């Protein structure tokens, strides 16, 4: 009996299985590792098969493993293809968005065309294209963008810029400076399209300043009325926006463009009076010559459509067109009242009925007083159904302007004026004190309480309170603790109707509390805005010395803020008596 087996080794068979023969006698420790008999028979049959058949059968792949690889590779390929399609679609959508998206609200902050807004804090986007001068329709078609930048360089031939966050409220304590630089030999045309900045005398707190480099300041604006188009003869402008830490507004938006010298223009609703200057339409034929060539006041009789004119008698009457019927739309009437030198003028309105609006922006009457220098100073603007207080002026010239828009019409007014001889006595206004009219600060009834022969009798009877003028406690927090505790409203000197309006205004002055001169400035400001009410029912302005002390102490501090002293102290009375003015 054989104790060994015959073994035939084939190289190709070794590829099919690592173990072609198994004998437990030679590997006792392996345990039952031999394949089952069926498998042994299968191996034996494969060894007995022809060589080429065994070769072909040995090269067949594992079907289960191959299908798994195919599925895996197919999935990866589909995933990559999907990612590629997504990237392509995203790029196509990004490039087609400006053409398919409608313009957002045109009140958003504007960004120049063709430039992606920068995220750098101190940069502002500008145009880099050399497009021709824009028309109004082209400007409106531009797609505005919410702009958060504050200042920067604007080197392109045209562009837009706006206050931070426009049209939302601009942040407090902002100081943004834009430098507009166009090519040498070109000049800059600037247009402020929208404006809503805290309004205050001389734009003391929040303001937009335009400065020509290197000549100096051109314009300072605040409030809610955009100025006319600004044409310059420089290629470099510096635009500065400043806000304090109190009252905010929506700010501004503006555009600029490079213009060849001599090719300046104005907007369609503006008056182009000479090479550079543009005027708002309501500044034309208003009695104040602003154009160097006087063209804004030329041929005004033809423009007023039969209203307005020159009144030179000692007494006169004038009225709105069609009075007492409704006045026409789009009227601009100017009456020039002139009496002999040495006379003043008393103006009174009767049956007053104009379109009512809080700021008298639509239909209104304005009164101007001539100065000794030949210019006109603004006295007041009136509208609504209540006649204005009588206007008494020490000057011998007044200008009365009546303007209407396209909207509501009403009955208008009838007005009379009378000349007053200022040289007949030492108390020229005594007989007119009872009217309590709106007048120059130096010609108030209080100044003339001591009349001829040092007697108070002539004027004291006329110092009774006005029908709607009664003393009331001072309620403005900033003005508590003055030398007096009663006031009266309306305040005809500054055009404020209630103490609430004063409180709103004084919020802007809180930023000055840190100045060394604040207490002196506070006394003067409260004396002007919340005047003293006397036991006789009259109101007293602050004395000139109070204003001068505040000016002397605060002028240098305000200069550091870039603001000149905003008040003319010479308009206030000298303390001729205890009842001439107040010492808050």
Swiss-Prot record:
Glycosylation sites: 233, 421, 458
PROSITE patterns attached to this UniProt entry: CUB, FZ, LDLRA_1, LDLRA_2
Domain LDL-receptor class A: 265-301, 426-460
Cytoplasmic side: 1-69
Transmembrane segments: 70-90
Topological region Extracellular: 91-584
CDD domains referenced in this protein's UniProt entry, alphabetically: CRD_FZ, CUB, LDLa
Bias type Low complexity, positions: 119-132
Origin: domain of life: Eukaryota
Subcellular location: Apical cell membrane
Expressing tissues: Expressed in retinal pigment epithelium and ciliary epithelium of the eye.
Keywords of this entry: Cell membrane, Disulfide bond, Glycoprotein, Membrane, Repeat, Signal-anchor, Transmembrane, Transmembrane helix
Record-linked Gene3D superfamilies: Frizzled cysteine-rich domain (1.10.2000.10), Low-density Lipoprotein Receptor (4.10.400.10), Spermadhesin, CUB domain (2.60.120.290)
Domain (CUB) ranges: 150-259, 307-420
Domain spans labelled FZ: 466-584
Pfam families: CUB, Fz, Ldl_recept_a
Membrane association type: Single-pass type II membrane protein
GO CC terms: apical plasma membrane
GO annotation, biological process: eye photoreceptor cell development; retina development in camera-type eye; visual perception
Cited InterPro entries: CUB_dom, Frizzled_dom, Frizzled_dom_sf, LDL_receptor-like_sf, LDLR_class-A_CS, LDrepeatLR_classA_rpt, Sperma_CUB_dom_sf
SS bond list: 150-176, 203-222, 266-278, 273-291, 285-300, 307-333, 360-383, 433-451, 445-459, 471-533, 479-526, 517-554, 543-581, 547-569
Keyword Transmembrane applies: yes
Protein's job: May play a role in eye development.
Assembly with partners or alone: Interacts with C1QTNF5.
Disorder cited: Defects in Mfrp are the cause of retinal degeneration 6 (RD6). RD6 is an autosomal recessive degeneration of the photoreceptors causing dysfunction of both rods and cones.
Name this protein carries in UniProt: Membrane frizzled-related protein
Organism of this sequence: Mus musculus
């Amino acid at each position: 009996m054989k104790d060994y087996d015959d073994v035939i080794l084939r190289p190709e068979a070794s590829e099919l299985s690592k173990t072609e023969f198994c004998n437990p006698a030679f590997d006792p420790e392996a345990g039952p590792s031999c394949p089952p008999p069926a498998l042994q028979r299968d191996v034996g049959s494969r060894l007995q098969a022809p060589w080429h058949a065994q070769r072909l059968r040995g090269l067949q792949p594992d079907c289960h493993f191959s299908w798994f690889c195919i599925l895996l590779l197919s999935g990866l390929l589909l995933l990559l293809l999907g990612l590629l399609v997504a990237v392509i679609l995203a790029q196509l959508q990004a490039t087609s968005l400006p053409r398919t998206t409608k313009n957002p609200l045109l009140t958003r902050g504007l960004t120049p065309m063709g430039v992606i807004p920068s995220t750098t804090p101190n940069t502002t986007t500008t145009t880099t294209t050399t497009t021709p001068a824009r028309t109004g329709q082209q400007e409106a078609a531009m797609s505005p963008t919410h702009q958060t930048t504050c200042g920067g360089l604007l080197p392109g031939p045209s562009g837009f810029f706006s206050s931070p966050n426009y049209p939302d409220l601009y942040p407090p304590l902002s100081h943004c400076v834009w430098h507009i630089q166009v090519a040498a030999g070109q000049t800059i045309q600037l247009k402020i399209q929208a404006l809503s900045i805290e309004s205050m005398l001389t734009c003391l707190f929040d303001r937009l300043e335009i400065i020509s480099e290197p000549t100096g300041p051109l314009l300072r604006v605040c409030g809610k009325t955009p100025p006319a188009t600004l044409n310059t003869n420089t290629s470099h402008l510096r635009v500065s926006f400043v806000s304090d830490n109190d009252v905010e507004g929506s700010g501004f938006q503006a555009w600029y463009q490079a213009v060849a010298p001599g090719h300046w223009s104005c907007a369609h609703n503006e008056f182009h009076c000479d090479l550079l200057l543009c005027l708002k339409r309501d500044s034309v034929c208003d009695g104040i010559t602003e154009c160097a060539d006087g063209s804004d006041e030329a041929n005004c009789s033809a423009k007023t459509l039969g209203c307005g004119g020159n009144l030179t008698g000692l007494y006169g009457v004038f009225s709105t067109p069609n009075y007492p019927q409704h006045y026409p739309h789009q009227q601009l009437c100017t009456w020039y009242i002139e009496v002999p030198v040495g006379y003043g003028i008393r103006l009174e309105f009767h049956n007053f009925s104009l379109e009512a609006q809080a700021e008298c922006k639509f239909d209104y009457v304005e009164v101007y007083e001539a100065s000794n220098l030949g210019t006109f100073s603004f006295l007041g603007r009136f509208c609504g159904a209540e006649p204005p207080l009588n206007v008494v002026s020490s000057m011998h010239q007044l200008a009365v302007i009546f303007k209407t828009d396209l909207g509501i019409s009403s009955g208008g007014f009838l007005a009379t004026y009378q000349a007053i001889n200022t040289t007949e006595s030492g108390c020229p206004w005594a007989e007119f004190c009872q009217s309590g009219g709106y007048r120059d600060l130096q010609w108030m009834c209080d100044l003339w309480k001591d009349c001829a022969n040092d007697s108070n009798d002539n004027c004291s009877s006329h110092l009774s309170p006005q029908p709607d003028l009664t003393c009331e406690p001072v309620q403005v927090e900033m003005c508590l603790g003055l030398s007096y505790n009663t006031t009266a409203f309306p305040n005809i000197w500054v055009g404020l109707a209630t103490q609430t309006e004063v409180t709103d205004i004084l919020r802007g002055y809180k930023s000055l509390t840190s100045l060394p001169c604040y207490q002196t400035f506070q006394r003067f400001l409260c004396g002007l805005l919340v005047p003293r009410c006397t036991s006789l029912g009259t109101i007293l302005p602050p004395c000139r010395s109070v204003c001068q002390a505040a000016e002397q102490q605060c002028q240098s501090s305000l200069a550091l803020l870039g603001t000149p002293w905003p008040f003319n102290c010479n308009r206030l009375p000298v303390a001729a008596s205890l009842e001439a003015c107040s010492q808050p």
